[in-house]
Amino acid sequence: MSQSLIVALDFPGKQDVEQFLRHFEGEELFVKVGMELFYKEGPAIITYLKEKGHKIFLDLKLHDIPNTVKSAMRSLASLDVDMVNVHAAGGSSMMKAAIEGLEEGKQEGKERPICIAVTQLTSTSEAMMKKEIGIEKTLEEAVAHYAKLTKESGLDGVVCSTLEVPKLREVCGSEFVTVTPGIRLASDDVNDQVRVATPKRARELGSSYIVVGRSITKAENPLEAYKTVKQQWEGVTV
């Protein structure tokens, strides 16, 4: 299950990434490249990470008109990344266009990247959703609605909180992919995320993938922190 543990490379540039990855010589990681790093370094950072043997979740959360998203996904698929995402709030036509773009852009002989949709950010509380975003449903209802729409649009799964995974299993089935950020070791600060969980709790709730950032990247010993998270995620007793 180690390949379903995704390490968030939330760094401002390649130099920081190189320094961090020195702790993981010989390890093939599944890493997340977000907006900050990709916008600074461009496709070259993807090439660098692929050459190191790492799998890549390119976390750009596309949200635009269908034709623009289709064209963007065609370009992203050509980078040979393993996972990409969009905002479910973009609607069914946009999500279907994303899949079309990925199919057109995928490298010959390769499967298209896994495509998932963001339901609600883990920094979103129910009060914020109702007051600022204008959604009157409960948070769980809103996430379930977006997840169902995502599945009907042909995507592979969603980004969601661990707390929502059991409900989404009911709504979308056991094969529907759930990628859960907001993962912290019990001793860590939650920082700016509201809906968080430990690796053990994520496993118990049925997450397909977990995304772990600061618990590993800010640790005094990132490799040891990675091993601790991995052990908890895989249910290994040491």
UniProtKB/Swiss-Prot annotation:
The keyword Lyase applies. Pfam families: OMPdecase. Signal peptide: none annotated. It catalyses: orotidine 5'-phosphate + H(+) = UMP + CO2. GO terms for cellular component: cytosol. Pathway: Pyrimidine metabolism; UMP biosynthesis via de novo pathway; UMP from orotate: step 2/2. GO terms for molecular function: orotidine-5'-phosphate decarboxylase activity. The active site is at residue 61. CDD domains: OMP_decarboxylase_like (cd04725). Its EC number is 4.1.1.23. Keywords: Decarboxylase, Lyase, Pyrimidine biosynthesis. One of its GO terms (biological process) is 'de novo' UMP biosynthetic process. PROSITE patterns: OMPDECASE. Substrate binds at residues 10, 32, 59-68, 122, 184, 193, 213-214. Belongs to the OMP decarboxylase family. Type 1 subfamily. HAMAP family: OMPdecase_type1_B. This is Orotidine 5'-phosphate decarboxylase. It comes from Bacillus cereus (strain ZK / E33L).
